């Protein structure tokens, strides 16, 4: 992680939105989750992806400075992202420009489908498939289980939300016994495993962190374009990390007190409030080699179930 020095003096204000930004920055720094490279990826995917995918280095530096991240940390993070194949750099005269690499395009789009989905719940009648392996599950199979959205519920038992004739190839285990059921009783043990897989503890913490942010947005005047962009970037940075790890499950298996649906709805509501002013900041400040950013494409309006 690049060393980050927060410069929060400019944020001290009675403005509740500025206070919300400062509070979240402090919390992320305290938990060692304020990663410059992750913030940059969040901004590039969330804000720049729908608007052509390319932005100037100066635009990125301006936003990161508002988030207390110095130029040196940004340069270090960009160098790391470029070396790892996440970002492509180009120059036009004296100006540098960044874009997410085409090699990670499908990864980014796949992530977006989970981050901005209207729900992480599958229909209640989604098939529940039990796969009982004849042998201990290898590390490769365990990774495949996570990748396809399945769940290990016993040492050699996998729960997969798929009909038998559509079982992912990686889970078609030789010698395995397969049992398909339209319903499955959620006992204590399974409930606890599902709670872990749905990131219940961290989702609850995120809900508690952003309820005051939502209240501040409802009570205060509209945030400045710069603060709206900064808060949007921070929130998606935090939400993205959890949304990509939440297991999508049939609605009939979800605990009544599962906090994820409420948290997703809260994030969607805040996002909608921030969208207008944050896009105005991009209109006024973000540049490409051709000038201003192009208008957003259709996928921006479809996020969180929009129309």
Please identify what each model-predicted range represents.
Residues 85:
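Glycine-centered, phosphate/nucleic-acid-interacting loop/turn motifs that mediate DNA/RNA or nucleotide
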Residues 135-227:
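Mid-protein regulatory/catalytic core that forms ligand/cofactor-binding pockets
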Residues 105-126:
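Short, amphipathic alpha-helical interaction segments positioned at domain boundaries
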Residues 91-97:
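Short, Lys/Arg-rich nucleic-acid/phosphate-binding segment
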Residues 195-307:
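C-terminal regulatory/effector modules of DNA-binding transcriptional regulators
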Residues 15-43, 105:
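Short alpha-helical segments that sit at the start of domains
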Residues 51-63:
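Short acidic, hydrophobic short linear motifs in intrinsically disordered regions
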Residues 69-80:
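Short amphipathic alpha-helical interaction segments
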């Amino acid at each position: 992680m690049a060393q980050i020095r927060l410069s929060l003096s400019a944020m001290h204000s009675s403005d509740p939105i500025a206070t919300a930004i400062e509070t979240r920055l402090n919390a992320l720094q305290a938990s060692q989750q304020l990663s410059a490279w992750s913030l940059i990826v969040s901004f590039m995917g969330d804000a720049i992806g729908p608007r052509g995918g390319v932005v100037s280095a100066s635009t990125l530096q301006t936003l990161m400075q508002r988030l207390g991240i110095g130029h040196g940390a940004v340069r270090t993070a960009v160098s790391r992202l470029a070396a790892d194949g996440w970002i492509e750099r180009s120059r036009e005269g004296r100006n540098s420009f960044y874009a997410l690499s085409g090699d990670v395009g499908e990864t980014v789009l796949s992530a977006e489908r989970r981050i901005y989905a209207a729900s992480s719940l599958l229909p209640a009648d989604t098939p529940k498939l039990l796969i009982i392996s004849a042998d201990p599950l290898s590390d490769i199979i365990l990774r495949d289980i996570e990748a396809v959205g399945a769940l290990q519920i016993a040492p050699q038992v996998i729960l997969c939300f798929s009909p038998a004739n559509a079982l992912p190839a990686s889970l078609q285990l030789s010698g395995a016994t397969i049992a398909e059921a339209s319903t499955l009783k959620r006992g204590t043990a399974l409930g606890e495993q599902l709670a872990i897989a749905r990131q219940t503890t961290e989702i609850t913490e995120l809900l508690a962190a952003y309820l005051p942010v939502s209240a501040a947005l409802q009570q205060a005047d509209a945030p400045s374009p710069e603060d709206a962009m900064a808060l949007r970037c921070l929130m998606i940075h935090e939400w993205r990390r959890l949304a990509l790890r939440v297991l999508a499950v049939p609605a009939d298996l979800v605990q009544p007190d599962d906090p994820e649906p409420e948290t997703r709805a809260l994030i969607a509501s805040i996002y909608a409030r921030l969208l207008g002013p944050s896009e105005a900041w991009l209109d006024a400040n973000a540049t490409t080699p051709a000038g201003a950013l192009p208008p957003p494409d259709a996928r921006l309006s479809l996020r969180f179930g929009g129309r």
